[in-house]
Structure formats: C-alpha cells, structure tokens
C-alpha cells in the first residue's frame, strides 16, 4: 500500500496538471494528449486503466469537455477521478 500510495499521489498530480493546463491544448493537437498518455502510463500503470471503468461517470463528464480525446482523457483523469470518488 505504501508504494501504491506514492504512485497514486504522483498520478493525481500529473492528471491535475493535464486537466487544467493542457485542457485547451487537447483541442489544438493530439500530440499533447499522446505525450501525457505516455507519461501517465509509465507512472500510473494498468491498475488505473481498470479504475477508469470504475469512475465512468467522472470520465463521462470529462468526455464532454475533452470530446476529441475522450478515451485518452479518461486514462489521464482516472487517478484524479478516483480520489474525487472517495
């Protein structure tokens, strides 16, 4: 749990950054989204991809904002949504 917790806090920090700063960038180019996805996959891992399904309502709300990158945004926002759900 200790290691997982530290990964979780890193994941939340990353996703919060992408959620706020790069929000408008998602519409401009997929390049930003691909970059954030690559970084987050290394930090977060497959466990949060599963969590994405658990926090579907939050990801669905994010889909309205990040429509062009809905599925990618869901992966990036998964840790942030997971924390918000608790």
From Swiss-Prot:
It comes from the Viruses. Encoded by inverted terminal repeats (ITR) sequences. This is Uncharacterized protein KP86R/DP86L.
């Amino acid at each position: 749990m200790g290691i997982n917790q530290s990964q979780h806090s890193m994941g939340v920090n990353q996703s919060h950054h992408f959620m706020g700063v790069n929000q408008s960038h998602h519409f401009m180019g997929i390049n930003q989204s691909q970059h954030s996805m690559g970084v987050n996959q290394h930090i977060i891992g497959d466990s949060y991809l599963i969590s994405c399904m658990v926090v579907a309502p939050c990801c669905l709300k994010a889909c309205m904002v990040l429509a062009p990158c809905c599925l990618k945004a869901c992966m990036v926002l998964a840790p942030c949504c997971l924390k918000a759900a608790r």
